[in-house]
A protein has these predicted regions:
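Formylglycine-dependent sulfatase
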Residues: 1-168
Length: 168
């Protein structure tokens, strides 16, 4: 299940369906779709998604407003826990890298937590913590990385990271 774009690939992976069977619009997952999060949770696994969501409401206000808020909410995707970027509206997504806007288990992380930090590090640390907390139980982790495409921004290992001001 792979497509030339990240969103159709992620929906295929999570639903097990080809895109002609699950497509309702770009950046949207049908709110009635059952994901592997549901299946794993129903079968006794502790489940986590940590990384990119971007499947609830992709369109900006001035671009196809009729498709806003039609996708699946992260809270309804079948996972016990989540730590995701772009959980809701496009205009609220901010940077996915430096100073990211991250929605974790029903609350946005505060700037005190995210300021100066790198999104992938926050996601990875949450995954490691989840695995430690659930090491005695069967668990399932889905890590849809945000690093797969543009915008290309400095990483914590680059000299430019300290002075880089990401879009908000």
């Amino acid at each position: 299940h792979a497509q030339p774009l990240c969103t159709p690939t992620r929906i295929q992976l999570m639903t097990g369906k080809y895109n002609f069977r699950n497509y309702i619009g770009f950046g949207l997952m049908d709110p009635n779709e059952k994901t592997f999060g549901h299946i794993m949770t129903d079968n006794g696994y502790k489940t986590l998604i940590s990384g990119k969501w971007q499947l609830y409401s992709y369109n900006p206000l001035d671009e196809m407003p009729e498709d806003r808020n039609k996708g699946q909410k992260i809270e309804d995707a079948g996972f016990d826990e989540f730590c995701v970027w772009h959980a809701h509206q496009t205009e609220e997504k901010g940077s996915r890298y430096k100073n990211p806007i991250i929605y974790q288990n029903g609350e946005y992380l505060t700037k005190e937590i995210t300021e100066g930090n790198y999104g992938e590090d926050i996601f990875s640390e949450y995954i490691l913590d989840f695995m430690d907390r659930n090491s005695d139980d069967p668990f399932f982790v889905y890590f849809p990385m945000t690093l797969t495409h543009r915008p290309l921004e400095p990483t914590p290992d680059s000299e430019e990271f300290a002075i880089f001001d990401p879009p908000s």
